[in-house]
């Protein structure tokens, strides 16, 4: 069994994990029945883990979202699809490995699946550029989404990036233009689009594949205009104030659901998705199937209208009205 990577606030579980591993080794090396002791320790560890994860701060949720063993885009795709075919290239000489996409089927419905892909170790992260896509990655994604729109395939996107790559080469190749073009084009696609934030949803890098009819988000994922570290450095000239920035930025699923930015918060297993990836995959698949079933019943015109209205109300100053009241007011004005 691979060794689990424990976060700072999970340190109270270290001793329990050691005891559980020792008992498992004893069971392997002898015929002694230790099932009862093992069950008691695992139950205790699960209970303590639930207590810890019930009261996570926004800064701690960021640590969970960045966990190196958290399920990635490819992990979820492999759970969903037996017929996944990856498509490569932006048709302009590049094939960014930080943003992947391809064809598959979910519950017998052909779909396009795409998303950011991080690595599991240093070597993989270098290949994947730590999940930070370059302009070619967003142009590849756009090419695949245009293909999906042409052949009436729903689009499923998975967001997990600290942000778009901000190096000099990316700026020279038109990073801002590539993301802006994706935003514009995604508003016009006449197929259902479901986006899920499975880890980090960082800035424009997340938005580049995040214009969707339904925006889902895991319980311990984060969605932010800038990383708390960057925000703290800009506002207070002190990166140590990142925890305060994380709270002020409203980056958690609970906050974003209240603000009307996302449509559903998906629950995670005790300890986060990295503790039970199959359970996380089943949760995500069930939610996607439910939302996709609803969206497929809508006409192309209804999809476009709903998508436009959804984003039109974001960022509007709210003094006393609820998000629902503003949406209703906006719809009435259009009529």
Curated annotation (Swiss-Prot):
Pfam families: ACCA (PF03255). The keyword ATP-binding applies. Residues 40-294 form the CoA carboxyltransferase C-terminal domain. Keywords: ATP-binding, Cytoplasm, Fatty acid biosynthesis, Fatty acid metabolism, Lipid biosynthesis, Lipid metabolism, Nucleotide-binding, Transferase. The keyword Lipoprotein does not apply. SUPFAM superfamilies: ClpP/crotonase. One of its GO terms (cellular component) is acetyl-CoA carboxylase complex. It catalyses: N(6)-carboxybiotinyl-L-lysyl-[protein] + acetyl-CoA = N(6)-biotinyl-L-lysyl-[protein] + malonyl-CoA. Its main location: cytoplasm. It is found in: Cytoplasm. GO terms for molecular function: acetyl-CoA carboxylase activity; ATP binding; carboxyl- or carbamoyltransferase activity. Pathway: Lipid metabolism; malonyl-CoA biosynthesis; malonyl-CoA from acetyl-CoA: step 1/1. Its EC number is 2.1.3.15. Component of the acetyl coenzyme A carboxylase (ACC) complex. First, biotin carboxylase catalyzes the carboxylation of biotin on its carrier protein (BCCP) and then the CO(2) group is transferred by the carboxyltransferase to acetyl-CoA to form malonyl-CoA. Belongs to the AccA family. Acetyl-CoA carboxylase is a heterohexamer composed of biotin carboxyl carrier protein (AccB), biotin carboxylase (AccC) and two subunits each of ACCase subunit alpha (AccA) and ACCase subunit beta (AccD). NCBIfam families: accA, AccA_sub, PRK05724.1. This is Acetyl-coenzyme A carboxylase carboxyl transferase subunit alpha.
